[in-house]
């Protein structure tokens, strides 16, 4: 059986890993063992943060919607409640974009929500009294 020499493969593996680690500070970009540890951690951070990014954006959208809603005299939770009651199916990403870039359209949506909440409030009180 022929002898297998792995030097070429090993060098390619190390070269690839060090290329991945380029841009890291100090030994983490130059020494194989340190670079390997850092690349492994970096991949874990990337994986985790790709999932965290979804929540971060949702949080940002909610803050923008809340600011726009309060500028129009309604709180975030009343706005969302009113939109659900009115049957408006616009997601938070679009609402946040409207709140930032198209204040008139956002104000119209807020009025829809306000009317739905007011109608539900009067309807609910009348049904409880009867």
Curated annotation (Swiss-Prot):
Disulfide bond sites:
none
Pfam families the record matches: Ribosomal_L20
Name one cellular component (GO) term: ribosome
Q: What's the domain of life for this entry?
A: Bacteria
Alphabetic keyword roster: Ribonucleoprotein, Ribosomal protein, RNA-binding, rRNA-binding
**What are the protein's GO molecular function terms?**
rRNA binding; structural constituent of ribosome
Q: Which CDD domains match?
A: Ribosomal_L20 (cd07026)
Q: Which GO terms describe its biological process?
A: ribosomal large subunit assembly; translation
Kindly give the InterPro entries that the UniProt entry links to this protein. Answer: Ribosomal_bL20 (IPR005813), RIBOSOMAL_L20_CS (IPR049946), Ribosomal_protein_bL20_C (IPR035566)
> Record's family?
Belongs to the bacterial ribosomal protein bL20 family.
Instruction: Show the HAMAP family listed in the entry.
Output: Ribosomal_bL20
Q: Which NCBIfam families match?
A: rplT_bact
The record's function comment reads:
Binds directly to 23S ribosomal RNA and is necessary for the in vitro assembly process of the 50S ribosomal subunit. It is not involved in the protein synthesizing functions of that subunit.
Q: Which PANTHER family match?
A: 39S RIBOSOMAL PROTEIN L20
Q: What is this protein called?
A: Large ribosomal subunit protein bL20
Biological source species: Salinispora arenicola (strain CNS-205)
């Amino acid at each position: 059986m022929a002898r297998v020499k792995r030097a070429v493969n090993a060098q390619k593996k190390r070269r690839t890993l060090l290329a991945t680690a380029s841009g890291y500070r100090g030994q983490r970009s130059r020494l194989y063992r340190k670079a390997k540890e850092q690349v492994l951690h970096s991949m874990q951070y990337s994986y985790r943060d790709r999932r965290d990014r979804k929540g971060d954006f949702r949080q940002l959208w909610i803050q923008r919607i809340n600011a726009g809603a309060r500028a129009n005299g309604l709180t975030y939770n009343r706005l969302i409640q009113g939109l659900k009651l009115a049957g408006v199916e616009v997601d938070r990403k679009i609402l946040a974009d409207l709140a930032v870039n198209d204040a008139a359209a956002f104000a119209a949506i807020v009025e829809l929500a306000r009317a739905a909440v007011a109608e539900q409030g009067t309807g609910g009180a009348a049904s409880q009294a009867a």
